[in-house]
C-alpha cells in the first residue's frame, strides 16, 4: 500500500519502459532537453534518467571531467518531504560519482536537480520536453483543509473526490512544451470514473493520448497495491501535426526481456501486431470514460447502447445504502438497540449476502429521520434521545455533525424507511462476477451495498440479467478493475447497463429469466439473456471472455 506520503515505489524495469515510451533515449542529445520529475521520492525514476543523460552526454561529445555542470538545466525534480529529498540527493550523487562525474560537480548537480517544494504550488522555471513519474496517491481527506482549498482554487481538474494525483497530471500537462511527452504510472481510476471527467476533457482538448499500457494483475511496484496501475503517455502535439491513434498493450509481464521489444513495438513507425500491441482511434472523447478494450467488444457495447434504454430509463432505480459516519454507534444488534421501534431498521450488510441469498445476522441501524425526511424531534423519542446522549461525543465528532450542529445526530445519508419494505436487488461493491441478491423487502441496505428497485421489471427476471455475462460486459467496460480481476459494481457503472422495457420482453423469455434467477442457475441466466439481447455466436463469445 502507499506510505503516509502517498508514495509507491516503482520497479526499475517499469521506469526504463516509460522512458523508452516517451522517447528519453540515449540516441538523442538529452543534454539539450529538459525533463521534469514532479514527485522524486527516493529517486526511483531519477537514477535511470541520470544514467541515460550522462551516457548520452558522453556519446554526443561531452566531457564529464570539465563540463558536467552544464547538465544542470536538463533535470528538475521536486520532493516535498525533507527526509525523502535527502535520501534521493544522496543516491543521485552516488550514481553520478559511479558514472564518472567529479565530487564537486556531482554535489552541485544534486543540489540543482532536486528541489524541496510542494510541486503543485512551486514556481516552475520553464516548459519541459519530458515529464515522467509516479504521482502521489493521497486522498482528499488526508490533505489539510486550508491547503486543499488552495489546490481547488488553482486546479480545475480537482473535482468531486479526486485524489492528489489528478492535479499533478494537470500541472505537468500545463508545462509540456510542444511535442513534449508525459509518461506516468498511476492508478487507472481517473480514466473511467466521475472525478476524472475534467482531466479527461483537458486531455481531449489540448493533448493526444499516444500510449496506454494496462498493468492489471502485474507487479509494477515494489509492494502490493489494491488499485491497478496503468501507464499513460500523453503528448502536447506540435502545431498542425496529424492526429494519431492510441497504441495499447494489455498486461505485459514485468521484465526487461518483455519491455524492451514491447517498447520498440509501441514506438515503431509500423504497428507490429505480433507484439501484442493494438491501435485504437477515438479513445479520448471529451470527458467521456476511456474505453480501451478490443474493438469487437467496444462495438457490441455501442450497439446495445444505441438500441436499448438504460436501467433507469427502463423504470429501475439504482442507489447506495446508508453511510452513518460512525457504524460503531449507529449499528448494533436489532434486538438490543435500546431505542423506540420506529427509530431502528433491520440492516443488510455485505456479511448478510451468502451464496446468492440473504442470511441476516440480526444487525440494525438507527433511523434519525421521519417519513417526510425531517430529522426527528428527540422530545418525542426519549429512549432514542438517551442513546444519542450516551454516545454524543463520538456522534458530534463526525464531519456531518460539525456541518449540521442543529441536526448533530443525523446520519451522513438520509434514510428512507420505505426502502426497507421495498423488494430490491442488492449488489456488493467489489466482486469478480455480478453478485446480485434478491431481498424481499425487509432490510435497509448498508453503504457498501448498492440497490436496484424496479417499477416495471420483475426483479427476479432482472436479477437473471444482472447475473449474466452481459452485466459484466457493461460494468467491465466502464469500471476500474481491482486486484484479482474484481470489478467495482458501483452505481455509476450499474447505470450504464442497458435493458429493454419489460413490456417488450416476450412472455416465455420473462418466465425463463425468472426461473433462472430463482434457481441460481448462472448458465440458464446467460442463455436467456443472450436471447433477450439477440446476441449472435460471435457476440456470445465476446461476453463469455469478459
Curated annotation (Swiss-Prot):
Q: InterPro entries in the record, alphabetically?
A: DNA_methylase_N6_adenine_CS, MethylTrfase_TaqI-like_dom, N4_N6_ade-DNA_methylase, SAM-dependent_MTases_sf, TaqI_C
Question: What EC number(s) would the UniProt record show?
Answer: 2.1.1.72
Any single GO molecular-function term of the entry would be: DNA binding
| Record field: catalytic activity | a 2'-deoxyadenosine in DNA + S-adenosyl-L-methionine = an N(6)-methyl-2'-deoxyadenosine in DNA + S-adenosyl-L-homocysteine + H(+)
Cited Pfam families: Eco57I, TaqI_C
Q: What class of enzyme is it?
A: transferase
Keywords attached to this entry: DNA-binding, Methyltransferase, Restriction system, S-adenosyl-L-methionine, Transferase
What family does the entry list? Belongs to the N(4)/N(6)-methyltransferase family.
Protein name, entry field: Type II methyltransferase M.XhoI
Amino acid at each position: 500500500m502507499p506510505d503516509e506520503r502517498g508514495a509507491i515505489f516503482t520497479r526499475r524495469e517499469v521506469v526504463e519502459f516509460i522512458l523508452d515510451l516517451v522517447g528519453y533515449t540515449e540516441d538523442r542529445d538529452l543534454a539539450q532537453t529538459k525533463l521534469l520529475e514532479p514527485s522524486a521520492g527516493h529517486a526511483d525514476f531519477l537514477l535511470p534518467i541520470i544514467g541515460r543523460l550522462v551516457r548520452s552526454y558522453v556519446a554526443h561529445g561531452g566531457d564529464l571531467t570539465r563540463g558536467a555542470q552544464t547538465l544542470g538545466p536538463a533535470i528538475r525534480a521536486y520532493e516535498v518531504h525533507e527526509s525523502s529529498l535527502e535520501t534521493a540527493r544522496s543516491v543521485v550523487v552516488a550514481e553520478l560519482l559511479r558514472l564518472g562525474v567529479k565530487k564537486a560537480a556531482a554535489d552541485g548537480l544534486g543540489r540543482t536537480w532536486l528541489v524541496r517544494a510542494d510541486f503543485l504550488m512551486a514556481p516552475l522555471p520553464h516548459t519541459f520536453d519530458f515529464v515522467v513519474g509516479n504521482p502521489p496517491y493521497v486522498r482528499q481527506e488526508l490533505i489539510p483543509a486550508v491547503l486543499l482549498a488552495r489546490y481547488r482554487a488553482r486546479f480545475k481538474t480537482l473535482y468531486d473526490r479526486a485524489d492528489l494525483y489528478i492535479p499533478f497530471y494537470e500541472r505537468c500537462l500545463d508545462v509540456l512544451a510542444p511535442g513534449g511527452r508525459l509518461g506516468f504510472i498511476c492508478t487507472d481510476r481517473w480514466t473511467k470514473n466521475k472525478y476524472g471527467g475534467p482531466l479527461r476533457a483537458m486531455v481531449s482538448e489540448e493533448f493526444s493520448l499516444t500510449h496506454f499500457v494496462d498493468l492489471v494483475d502485474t507487479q509494477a511496484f515494489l509492494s502490493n497495491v489494491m488499485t491497478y496501475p496503468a501507464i499513460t503517455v500523453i503528448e502536447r502535439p506540435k502545431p498542425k501535426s496529424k492526429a494519431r491513434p492510441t497504441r495499447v498493450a494489455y498486461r505485459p509481464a514485468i521484465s526487461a526481456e518483455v519491455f524492451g521489444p514491447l517498447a520498440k513495438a509501441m514506438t515503431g513507425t509500423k504497428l507490429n501486431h505480433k507484439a501484442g500491441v493494438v491501435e485504437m482511434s477515438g479513445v479520448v472523447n471529451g470527458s467521456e470514460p476511456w474505453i480501451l478494450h478490443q474493438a469487437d467488444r467496444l462495438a457490441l457495447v455501442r450497439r446495445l447502447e444505441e438500441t436499448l434504454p438504460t436501467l433507469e430509463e427502463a423504470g429501475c432505480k439504482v442507489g447506495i445504502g446508508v453511510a452513518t459516519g460512525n457504524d460503531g454507534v449507529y449499528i448494533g444488534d436489532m434486538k438490543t438497540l435500546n431505542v423506540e421501534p420506529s427509530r431502528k431498521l433491520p440492516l443488510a450488510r455485505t456479511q448478510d449476502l451468502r451464496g446468492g441469498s440473504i442470511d441476516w445476522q440480526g444487525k440494525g441501524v438507527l433511523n434519525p429521520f421521519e417519513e417526510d425526511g425531517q430529522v426527528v424531534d428527540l422530545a418525542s423519542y426519549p429512549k432514542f434521545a438517551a442513546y444519542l446522549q450516551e454516545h454524543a461525543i463520538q456522534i458530534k465528532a463526525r464531519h456531518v455533525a460539525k456541518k449540521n450542529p442543529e441536526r448533530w445526530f443525523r446520519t451522513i445519508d438520509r434514510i428512507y424507511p420505505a426502502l426497507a419494505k421495498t423488494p430490491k436487488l442488492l449488489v456488493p461493491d467489489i466482486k469478480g462476477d455480478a453478485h446480485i441478491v434478491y431481498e424481499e423487502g425487509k432490510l435497509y441496505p448498508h453503504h457498501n451495498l448498492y440497490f436496484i428497485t424496479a417499477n416495471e421489471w420483475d426483479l427476479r427476471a432482472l436479477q437473471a440479467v444482472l447475473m449474466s455475462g452481459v452485466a459484466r460486459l457493461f460494468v467491465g467496460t466502464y469500471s476500474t478493475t481491482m486486484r484479482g480481476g474484481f470489478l467495482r459494481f458501483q452505481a455509476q457503472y450499474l447505470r450504464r447497463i442497458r435493458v429493454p422495457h419489460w413490456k417488450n420482453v416476450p412472455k416465455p423469455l420473462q418466465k425463463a429469466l425468472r426461473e433462472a434467477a430463482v434457481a441460481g442457475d448462472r448458465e440458464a441466466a446467460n442463455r436467456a439473456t443472450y436471447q433477450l439481447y439477440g446476441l449472435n455466436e460471435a457476440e456470445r463469445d465476446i461476453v463469455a471472455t469478459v
